[in-house]
């Protein structure tokens, strides 16, 4: 039996707890969340801890799941590691590369597992695209292009997710596509350029994050990538396109359909596990109160079918690893800190590029910091 404690049981943390509790030989023994802990503890019949220190030091906990707001990840991760607890940390791992390195280093020094919650790696469509790329089906990769955007109206109650200092804004909070590009290409960029701004979302009812971001990545191999995020787009789009010398792949999360195009012929594949899940996401994109690509949940809200399936898959992967399973090659970087650190390093380089209006080398971010 592996016992889990969860720090932060709002929208996503509560769902992580619910699905982990469903796996064989897995048990949520306690939670800590001053606002939401009591209700979730009652639901899961576990202990509502009175403090973070009480949870991370408890003998009832083998692994700590950290799902607090983004800016509060570092303390529970490091305290869990110092208490010899395995750690799962929801994305983005941190809001700075230095913090991310400190967290990964603490877990390595303690000899405990550290898993980055980059859930997009578990998409059926991403796994299939990775397989096609490795098999050379679309030839040599030339470029990637991603978009994750939509339109956001004024909110009666502002979430922490709209405050840049707490969420990191679209770049960090929606880091999935950046991590996905680096995962699919198998390398991190050499240089990063980003422009952006807040063009339409200032004043009452809005946070302080940029509502448009445009990033360009140049890789050591010569590959290129462009990425776009924002909440000031009245034509919502959400996709990843990989272009090769023989063909291309599109993982479209707005229309929820995967496509492989070679020689003018298109073959379709599932983005998620079943057609029902793809249909569920497509329908949700059309009916949600906010465009699907930029929508976010809140405590008390349950995840849609497609996301519930992903959480089940992700938590089962973690549980199997802690039970002694060996990870497949494509997932090793989720467990050794590489995915966590490389995504944040690129995001930090992009942030520096925008603030200083110049092209930034990744080496400027990572040269002074190492993980043993």
UniProtKB/Swiss-Prot annotation:
Q: What quaternary structure, including any partners, is listed in this protein's UniProt entry?
A: Homodimer.
**Species name for this entry?**
Escherichia coli (strain K12)
Please name the GO terms of the biological process aspect recorded for this protein, alphabetically.
DNA damage response; N-acetylneuraminate catabolic process
Q: Which gene encodes it?
A: nanY
> EC no.?
4.2.1.-
- Transferase as a keyword? no
Q: Name one Pfam family in it.
A: GFO_IDH_MocA
Which keywords belong to this entry? Lyase, NAD
Per its UniProt entry, which superkingdom is the organism in?
Bacteria
User: Which InterPro entries does the record match to this protein?
Assistant: Gfo/Idh/MocA-like_OxRdtase_C (IPR004104), Gfo/Idh/MocA-like_OxRdtase_N (IPR000683), Gfo/Idh/MocA_Oxidoreductases (IPR051450), NAD(P)-bd_dom_sf (IPR036291)
What does it do?
Answer: Hydratase involved in the degradation of sialic acids. Catalyzes the reversible conversion of the dehydrated form of N-acetylneuraminate (Neu5Ac), 2,7-anhydro-N-acetylneuraminate (2,7-AN), to Neu5Ac. Also catalyzes the irreversible conversion of 2-deoxy-2,3-didehydro-N-acetylneuraminate (2,3-EN) to Neu5Ac. The reaction mechanism involves keto intermediates and the transient formation of NADH.
Q: How is its activity regulated?
A: All conversions require NAD(+) as a cofactor, which is regenerated in the reaction. The presence of EGTA and several divalent cations does not affect the activity.
Q: What induces it?
A: Negatively regulated by the transcriptional repressor NanR. Induced by N-acetylneuraminate, via inactivation of NanR.
Q: How is the cofactor bound?
A: Binds 1 NAD(+) per subunit.
Reactions accelerated catalytically: N-acetyl-2,7-anhydro-alpha-neuraminate + H2O = N-acetyl-alpha-neuraminate; 2-deoxy-2,3-dehydro-N-acetylneuraminate + H2O = N-acetyl-alpha-neuraminate
Protein name in UniProt: 2,7-anhydro-N-acetylneuraminate hydratase
- Coiled-coil intervals: none
The GO terms this record gives for MF are: hydro-lyase activity; nucleotide binding; protein homodimerization activity
Q: Which cofactor does it need?
A: NAD(+)
> Per the similarity annotation, which family is this?
Belongs to the Gfo/Idh/MocA family.
**Chain residues that bind NAD(+):** 11-12, 33, 36, 68, 70, 73, 90-91, 160
Q: Remarks, anything else?
A: Bell et al. show that this hydratase allows the growth of E.coli strain BW25113 on 2,7-AN as a sole carbon source. However, Kentache et al. show that it allows the growth of E.coli on 2,7-AN and 2,3-EN, which are produced during the degradation of sialoconjugates by sialidases from other bacteria, provided the repressor NanR has been inactivated.
Outcome of gene disruption: Inactivation of the gene in NanR-deficient cells prevents the growth on 2,7-AN and 2,3-EN. Deletion of the gene in strain BW25113 results in loss of growth on 2,7-AN but not on Neu5Ac.
The pH note for this entry is: Optimum pH is 7.5-8.0 for 2,7-AN hydratase activity.
Catalytic EC class: lyase
Q: Does the keyword Magnesium apply?
A: no
């Amino acid at each position: 039996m592996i016992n889990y404690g969860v720090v932060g049981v709002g929208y996503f943390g509560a769902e992580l707890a619910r699905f982990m509790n469903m796996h064989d030989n897995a048990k949520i023994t306690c939670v800590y969340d001053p606002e939401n802990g009591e209700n979730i503890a009652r639901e899961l019949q576990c202990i509502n801890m009175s403090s973070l220190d009480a949870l991370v030091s408890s003998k009832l906990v083998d692994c700590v799941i950290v799902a607090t707001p983004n800016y509060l990840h570092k303390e529970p991760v490091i305290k869990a590691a110092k208490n010899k607890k395995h750690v799962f940390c929801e994305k983005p791992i941190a809001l700075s590369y230095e913090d991310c390195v400190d967290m990964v280093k603490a877990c390595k020094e303690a000899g405990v597992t550290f898993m980055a919650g980059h859930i997009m790696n578990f998409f059926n469509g991403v796994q299939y695209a990775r397989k096609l790329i490795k098999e050379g089906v679309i030839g040599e990769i030339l470029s990637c292009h991603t978009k994750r955007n939509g339109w956001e109206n004024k909110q009666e109650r502002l979430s922490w997710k709209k405050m840049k200092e707490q969420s990191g804004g679209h770049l960090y909070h929606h880091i999935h596509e950046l991590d996905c590009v680096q995962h699919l290409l198998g390398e991190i960029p050499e240089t990063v350029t980003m422009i952006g701004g807040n063009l339409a979302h200032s004043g009452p009812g809005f946070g302080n994050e940029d509502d448009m971001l445009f990033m360009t990545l140049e890789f050591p191999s010569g590959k290129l990538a462009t990425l776009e995020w924002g909440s000031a787009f009245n034509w919502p789009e959400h996709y990843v396109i990989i272009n090769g010398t023989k063909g291309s792949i599109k993982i479209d999360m707005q229309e929820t359909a995967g496509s492989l195009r070679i020689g003018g012929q298109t073959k379709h594949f599932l983005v998620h596990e079943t057609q029902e899940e793809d249909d569920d996401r497509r329908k949700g994109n059309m009916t949600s109160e906010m465009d699907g690509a930029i929508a976010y949940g809140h405590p008390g809200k349950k995840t849609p079918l497609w996301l519930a399936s992903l959480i089940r898959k992700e938590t089962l992967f973690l549980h199997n690893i802690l039970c002694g399973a060996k990870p497949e090659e494509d997932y090793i970087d989720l467990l050794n800190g590489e995915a966590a650190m490389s995504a944040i390093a690129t995001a930090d380089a992009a942030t520096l590029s925008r603030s200083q209006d110049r092209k930034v080398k990744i080496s400027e971010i990572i040269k002074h910091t190492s993980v043993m």
